[in-house]
Amino acid sequence: MKRVYNFSPGPAALPQEVIKQAAEEMTNWRGSGLSVMEMSHRGREFTEILATTKADLRSLLSIPDNYKILLMQGGAIAENAIVPMNLVGSKAQPATIDFVNTGHWSSKTIEEAHKYAKVNIAASSEDKDFTYVPARDTWKLTPDAAYVHICTNETIGGVEFDFTPDVGNVPLVADMSSNILSREIDISKYAVIYAGAQKNIGPAGVTIVIVRDDMLGHALPICPSAFDWKLVDEHDSMFNTPPTYPIYIAGLTFQWMLRQGGVAAMEQVNIAKAKLIYDYLDSTDFYVNSVPAANRSRMNVPFFLKDESLNGKFITEADAQGLVQLKGHSSVGGMRASIYNAMPIEGVQALVAFMKDFEKKYG
């Protein structure tokens, strides 16, 4: 059966080399006679997988030694609660958290944070339907905030930070679920980075948390032990049974990325892929994307047909061409092409060619 180009926003496409290797090792991991899915998480085989996975991630992102890598469960949605529970405990209560609201996922984080702290919306792009990132000089920060939170890429609106904000001595926390490993970043500018795996890392089930060591030990008394970063770190991400198979696939993805040349090489490919789509969108009025160039996401490209009555035809005909999962989020409609690291440039070329043909046919 021919493989399709999968533009799903998540769970997203995996590198074909990773899928092939996982298939080959499914029933017998490297001569062990075991599938990774049935290994003891404390056995020699999985301990090796875990250590290699964490070491490769540290290498890919140049993570400094004073940062811990935690492999957790619950996705970024769970971290919306876990982050404040871990960071506000040492502050006078109620603590204040500053948020920059750039869209759907930022809003979800803010909604959850109200349960644990006072919330200050330091900046928001809601005035223009979340189509931009507010300039840093417009932010109204709280001097003694527990932390400042940003979502570096909004998958629904297709809005991405093109800068790392300077927030002074207040810890900067970032949800990087949809653009981690897609561009080079300076980890030392952040106190905490978290990311669900199912976009640029692997299948759903494991959540990456990168936390500076001075951020440990500040949990609220109500924080469940399994979600206390200090305890998770002390138990090497095995306070409870970890999501072993998603960790294994994440490890294969990290090794694939290293073979491609690492994050710097991936970033150049991602720039090229995004440019192909945006250049075409800017050349026509048949399709519309309203995000300013500086804030356009390299990972998620939403676009709309000027004649929305053609939406159904677009999806049906794209599916027939092996271009799948292009329907936009239900909250905004239209179309969305998610072009994470695993999407080859050939897939983007095929999509743009289809879009041009569709315009000729119906424009």
From Swiss-Prot:
Annotated compartments: Cytoplasm
Binding residues for L-glutamate: R42
Reactions mediated catalytically: O-phospho-L-serine + 2-oxoglutarate = 3-phosphooxypyruvate + L-glutamate; 4-(phosphooxy)-L-threonine + 2-oxoglutarate = (R)-3-hydroxy-2-oxo-4-phosphooxybutanoate + L-glutamate
EC number, UniProt record: 2.6.1.52
SUPFAM superfamilies registered for this protein in UniProt: PLP-dependent transferases
Cofactor binding notes: Binds 1 pyridoxal phosphate per subunit.
Main location (coarse class): cytoplasm
Modified residues (N6-(pyridoxal phosphate)lysine): K199
Presence of keyword Kinase: no
Transmembrane segments: none
Keyword Cell inner membrane: no
NCBIfam families referenced in this protein's UniProt entry, alphabetically: PRK05355.1, serC_1
Function according to Swiss-Prot or TrEMBL: Catalyzes the reversible conversion of 3-phosphohydroxypyruvate to phosphoserine and of 3-hydroxy-2-oxo-4-phosphonooxybutanoate to phosphohydroxythreonine.
Similarity section: Belongs to the class-V pyridoxal-phosphate-dependent aminotransferase family. SerC subfamily.
Protein name as it appears in the record: Phosphoserine aminotransferase
Organism: Janthinobacterium sp. (strain Marseille) (Minibacterium massiliensis)
